[in-house]
């Protein structure tokens, strides 16, 4: 269960993986895009996981429909704005919304820097209207190669005052982190934090590389750390965060069952792991589900669930003063 008088955070939440079915339908119609169905009920199975059996291929095919309808920069702005409202509706006090501007721009050849600006505008408007605190993490999509990632990074850094970190996501096996060392030197030189998707498709060596060569202080998913005792010790001793996404890891076949997810062992070992959604619209879940259903199914005790919630605030890319402000805001909440 969620501890009400502690801030609830979602630090690993893809803005471009959380596009409402209704929005996909409306934007598809607006831009004359052929969709697999033309009402919400019929469209849902094409854009959201409804199958019981996990499948990475099915997951990714559903993910792509959201960005397929981003026909102009206003559509990107709308999606960013709605993401802030969705976070509010999920009882989240602080969200870090991550997005790949190249992925969002690709289908309709939008200007990548324009996408970043539109997302910043949408999130800032959402914060004003909904009173929730959110920050942005820019993603380099390694799947598209080093040159595309440099273009993406240039666009992200053009709005660096509105972005707290840069992430590397996508094809972990085909595009290993060593190809992006110079990119992340630019990130660190710009004063931004580093989080990297690692130890999801590839093994623990990918996590070592992200930490030691790219400068990651947080790792997205990181499930393969469990196979490397030295890495487990290093994560705990150096307070490297693990952004765990239980339902997502099951739906993408990263783990074969929630019961076999390593999150409980991470927490037992003193690793700073927290609970997050990943792509909530595609998964058909929200953050309360991760706390109330997925975490107990993964074997976490109530005390461990509470610890994961505490870890989420500690790992947030905000100042100690901002963390204290969030704590103060919710301390009397019941």
Curated annotation (Swiss-Prot):
Pfam families: A_deaminase. GO terms for molecular function: 2'-deoxyadenosine deaminase activity; adenosine deaminase activity; zinc ion binding. InterPro entries: A_deaminase, A_deaminase_dom, Ado/ade_deaminase, Metal_Hydrolase. One of its GO terms (cellular component) is cytosol. Keywords: Hydrolase, Metal-binding, Nucleotide metabolism, Zinc. Binds 1 zinc ion per subunit. GO terms for biological process: adenosine catabolic process; hypoxanthine salvage; inosine biosynthetic process; nucleotide metabolic process; purine ribonucleoside monophosphate biosynthetic process. The record marks 221 as: Important for catalytic activity. Zn(2+) binds at residues 12, 14, 197, 278. The active site is at 200 (proton donor). Substrate binds at residues 14, 16, 170, 279. The keyword Metal-binding applies. Its EC number is 3.5.4.4. It catalyses: adenosine + H2O + H(+) = inosine + NH4(+); 2'-deoxyadenosine + H2O + H(+) = 2'-deoxyinosine + NH4(+). Its cofactor is Zn(2+). Belongs to the metallo-dependent hydrolases superfamily. Adenosine and AMP deaminases family. Adenosine deaminase subfamily. HAMAP family: A_deaminase. Catalyzes the hydrolytic deamination of adenosine and 2-deoxyadenosine. PANTHER family: ADENOSINE DEAMINASE. This is Adenosine deaminase. It comes from Vibrio parahaemolyticus serotype O3:K6 (strain RIMD 2210633). The gene is add.
């Amino acid at each position: 269960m969620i501890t009400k008088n502690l801030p609830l955070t979602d630090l690993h939440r893809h803005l471009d993986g959380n596009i409402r079915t209704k929005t996909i339908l409306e934007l598809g119609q607006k831009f004359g895009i052929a969709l697999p169905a033309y009402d919400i009920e019929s469209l849902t199975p094409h854009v959201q996981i409804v199958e019981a059996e996990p499948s990475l291929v099915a997951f990714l095919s559903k993910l792509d429909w959201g960005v397929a309808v981003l026909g102009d920069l206003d559509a990107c702005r709308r999606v960013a704005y709605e993401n802030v409202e969705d976070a509010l509706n999920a009882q989240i006090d602080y969200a870090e919304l991550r997005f790949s501007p190249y992925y969002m721009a690709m289908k309709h050849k939008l200007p990548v820097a324009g996408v970043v600006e539109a997302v910043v505008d949408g999130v800032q408007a959402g914060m004003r209207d909904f009173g929730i605190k959110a920050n942005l993490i820019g993603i380099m999509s390694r799947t598209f190669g080093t040159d595309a990632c440099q273009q993406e990074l240039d666009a992200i850094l053009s709005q660096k005052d509105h972005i707290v970190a840069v992430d590397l996501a996508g094809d972990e096996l085909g595009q290993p982190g060593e190809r992006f060392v110079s990119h992340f030197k630019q990130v660190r030189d710009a004063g931004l934090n580093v989080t990297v998707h690692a130890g999801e498709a590839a093994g623990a060596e990918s996590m070592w590389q992200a930490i030691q060569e790219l400068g990651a202080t947080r790792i997205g998913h990181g499930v393969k750390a469990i196979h490397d005792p030295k890495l487990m010790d290093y994560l705990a001793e150096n307070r490297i965060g693990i952004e765990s996404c239980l339902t997502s890891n099951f739906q993408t076949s990263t783990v074969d069952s929630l019961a076999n997810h390593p999150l409980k062992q991470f927490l037992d070992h003193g690793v700073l792991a927290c609970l997050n959604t990943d792509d909530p619209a595609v998964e058909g879940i929200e953050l309360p589900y991760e706390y109330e259903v997925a975490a107990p199914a993964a074997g976490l005790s109530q005390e461990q669930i509470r610890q994961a919630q505490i870890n989420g605030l500690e790992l947030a890319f905000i100042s100690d003063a901002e963390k204290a402000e969030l704590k103060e805001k919710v301390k009397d909440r019941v």
